[in-house]
């Protein structure tokens, strides 16, 4: 009988955790509150959501929503995020795949001037990392999650909204636009 080659792993569960309302592995919460967009019956729908871990901190420990650190807060301190993942990776046999959220492109915090600094920081940790994704905010049209205020989410919690846009086969690239997706 062969021995297991690895015993410790952290699954890439960002989206799965959000859908299940549970832990997302080593990922920080995306945002305290967000709008979740999804396709239902060929139409885009969305709901306002309060992250379950954030809600628990608010209710049980009386922590103010604006004091809860999220992936969007860490976007401005990507070195801290990379360092954390590299430190955890030392104790995990398999690769940790994690999303490094970045500020939107061409903003004060993410622009041509910052590319060299980001490259140097990434090079500093790359030998200790096995997997990651960089995702600048707003880099994809129709993002599935959009941060909103806690107050807005509480006000509209439990309601389902429908966008006015009807979709066709989301990956039908035979149409005139030649674009797959939204």
Model-derived features with residue positions:
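Catalytic alpha/beta core of large soluble enzyme barrels
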Residues: 3, 8-174, 178-182
């Amino acid at each position: 009988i062969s021995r297991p080659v690895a015993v410790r792993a952290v699954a890439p569960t960002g989206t799965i955790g959000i859908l299940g309302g549970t832990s997302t592995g080593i990922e920080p919460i995306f945002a305290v509150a967000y709008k979740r967009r999804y396709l239902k019956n060929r139409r885009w729908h969305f709901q306002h959501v309060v992250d379950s871990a954030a809600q628990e901190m608010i209710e049980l420990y009386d922590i103010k929503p604006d004091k809860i650190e999220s992936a969007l807060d860490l976007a401005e301190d990507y070195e801290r995020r990379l360092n954390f993942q590299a430190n955890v990776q030392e104790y995990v046999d398999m690769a940790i795949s994690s999303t490094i959220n970045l500020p939107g492109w061409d903003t004060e915090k993410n622009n041509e001037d910052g590319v060299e600094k980001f490259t140097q920081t990434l090079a500093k940790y790359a030998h200790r990392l096995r997997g990651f994704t960089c995702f600048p905010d707003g880099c994809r049209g129709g993002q599935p999650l959009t941060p909103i205020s806690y107050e807005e989410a509480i006000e509209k919690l439990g309601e389902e909204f429908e966008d006015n846009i009807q979709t066709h086969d989301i990956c039908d690239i035979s149409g005139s636009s030649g674009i797959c997706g939204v």
